[in-house]
Every structure is written in structure tokens, then in C-alpha cells.
Amino acid sequence: MLYIYIKTQNALVQRINFNLDSQELPQNILWIDLLHPSAAEIAFISSEFNLEFPTKEEREEIELSAKYWEDNATITINAHFLVRDLKSDEEDRNLIKLRTEIVTFATAKNILFTIRYNEFSTFEEIQARILASPKNFEDGFDIIDKMFEVRVEKDADLLEWIDKEARRLRTSVLEKKDEYSYDEMLKDISSLQELNMRVRDSLFDKRRAMTSLLKSDKIDKDIKQNLTIVLKDLNSLVEFSVSQLNILDNIQTILASQINIEQNKVIKIFTVATVAMMPPTLIGTVYGMNFKFMPELELHYAYPIVLGVMVISIILPLVVFKKKGWL
């Protein structure tokens, strides 16, 4: 599907759904958004505007040269977009799932071209801004500028959510709340660490793209000024994500220490029980021997006496352990 945004004579922006079979390209194009494009649609736009869009394999390459390249007439950017899926597990604990999608941006003749294979809230927000305030979007570079600005804001929202969840977890660990098991807490910590690293990778990806755009002579002064501000915000988010990872590592260390303490308590209980049972076991073993001459066995009260001695031998070590503070 091709969505074309054009500037009308009264300085408004109009969006049209373009059909290859029945329409010709309009004038005063601001942005061509290719959503789930067919091979024919990509070939048509490439031919009309003398563009070379990256293939699927090129879009997924991790080299810097595959993320951004520029020639005399065009700029092409392959950017990673984080898509947020909000799900709830059986206990109604909100968990964020993220997936990474690649969006291709290209500029030619001050027109922005985007290729994407999924819906993004960022695009919906930018589309609404363009239609509501068309004067703020003179060309395709203005759209790229606002696109990166919105994406950084959304990454900031994700980091804020991670920070809130990390603080909640830290409180649960320190106060030893029983609402979650250790397994669930470790799972949540691991999930938050994974989310943090995904967001940080996304920030690094945008920083590389914006740094390259700032070096381009195709970008005007006002856009570069705004990109510089956005880049400063992005760098502060990177620092914040690093501090978050340190906090999560600290929580994991505290939790691991608590698990070790609990394990030591269990081991101590079994150790005390073993030591306490050794004297009566010894007594029972002695009187279980099949010697012919054991005079005390002939006593009328031998059995209750031996049982009493065994009970005393159990209680005595426990009293000693209690006084020593081992229990």
C-alpha cells in the first residue's frame, strides 16, 4: 500500500491512497509511505525517483555502512524500531514484550520515502501532526527530524517503565514480600535486563543515524539544531540505561544473597537435627547388640529408662545450641 502526502495550494497536507493501476503521481509530494509494499510498488517508486532501495538482506545487516549511506542526491537510513506488546500473565502482572522492526528511510528531491512492514504508533503520531500542523513540515527532512524525536521520547517512556519496575522489585526484595517467589523475581530481573539492553541498542542505532545526519550538507541549519538537542537527550538516556543496569545487578546480588541465606538456614536445620539424633542413635545401637550378657536388660524398668535417656540426649544438644545462638 502506498500512502502519499502532498502539499496543497492552501498550505495544507492531503493524504491519498495511491493505486499503481489507475493513478499518476501527484505534484508537490512531501512523503511517500510504503506499508507492506509489493515488489511492483517498490520497483515503480525506484524507477520514478531514481532510487535504489535496500533488499531484505541489506536491511538486516549490522555493519554501519548498511545502516546509513549517502550520495550526491539521496540519503538512505535503515533504522531499528522497538515495537511494544503489552501482555498479562496468569497473575495479572503487566509484562512488556518488545520486538525489533527495521524501517527504511530514504530522501530524494526533499521527499521522504519510508518502507515498513508493520504498523507503528510513531508513524500514526507523525501522520496526525502533519495533517494538524502542515506548516511545521516543509520537506521530508522535517519529517525525519520529528520521527527521531518521537522515537527517542518513546524509548524514554520505556526506560521510565523499567525504572519503576526495578524500584518495585528492589522494595519487594529488601522487604522480603511473599507476593512473588524467588524464581519469579529472578525471571523479572532477567526480563528487565533484556528490555534495558534492547532499548539501549535502539538508542545506539538512532545515535549513529543522527550523528551521520548532522554531518550531511543536505540538512538545513534549523533541523541540525533540533537534532543536536534530541541527540543530547538521547545521550542522557544512554547514561540512564547504564545506571539502570547497575541497579538491576545490585538487586540480583541482594536476591542471590537472600537465597544463600535461606539455603544456609535449611542446611543448618538438617545439621542440628542430625547432631541431635546422634546420641539416641548410639544408645539404640548399643542396646540393639545381641550380646549374651547384658545385665541391665533384665531390669523391670530398663525400657522406659533407656527411652528417657534417649529423649534427654536429644534435648541436651538442642539446649546447648540454643545457648550458643546457633538456633
From Swiss-Prot:
A motif (Probable selectivity filter) lies at residues 288-290. The keyword Transcription does not apply. It comes from the Bacteria. Pfam families: CorA. The chain crosses the membrane at residues 269-289, 301-321. Disulfide bonds: none annotated. It is found in: Cell inner membrane. One of its GO terms (molecular function) is cobalt ion transmembrane transporter activity. GO terms for cellular component: plasma membrane. It is a multi-pass membrane protein. Mediates influx of magnesium ions. Alternates between open and closed states. Activated by low cytoplasmic Mg(2+) levels. Inactive when cytoplasmic Mg(2+) levels are high. Homopentamer. In the absence of Mg(2+), interactions between subunits are weakened, and dimers, trimers and tetramers can be observed in vitro. The central ion permeation pathway is formed by the first transmembrane domain from each of the five subunits. Mg(2+) binding strengthens interactions between subunits and leads to the formation of a symmetrical homopentamer surrounding a closed ion permeation pathway. Low Mg(2+) concentrations trigger both a conformation change within each subunit and a loosening of the interactions between subunits. This results in an open ion conduction pathway. In addition, this results in a less symmetrical shape of the whole complex. This is Magnesium transport protein CorA. It comes from Campylobacter jejuni subsp. jejuni serotype O:2 (strain ATCC 700819 / NCTC 11168).
